[in-house]
Amino acid sequence: MITRHNPTQLHNPPGYHHVTVVEAGRLAFLAGQCPLDAFGALVGAGDIDLQIDQVAANAAAVLAAVGARPDQVVRSVVYVVSDDNSVLAAAWRRLTLSVIGSAFTTASTLLGVTRLGFSGQLVEVDLTAAL
């Protein structure tokens, strides 16, 4: 069972929760999902929207491979190569509207970073799901 809470002593966050509680059970820890195609090639060089779409598709495939749905995600960390708040906000919005959008209603962190692992990579998503 998964429950999500916002303590009354804290601000009410837009679209996600401060804490997610999972009753004892199985967890799936996804490796960081990158904007790579099935052959390992970068998708959407220089285009963050195309990269987000690929990351979302990859994450959906990995979740499905272990019998999980996006609404079973209990923790997300999103990395975006930018220090511009408008770019970070746009990336967050696109993810929340993607095929894995419900994964981002849980305990989440959005980080602007200077670089990711692959040359030209602009976004990466790290998810944990309760099965």
Regions found by a protein language model. Give the residues of each.
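N-terminal presequence-like segments and the immediate start of the first folded domain
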Residues: 1-57, 61-66, 71-74, 80-131
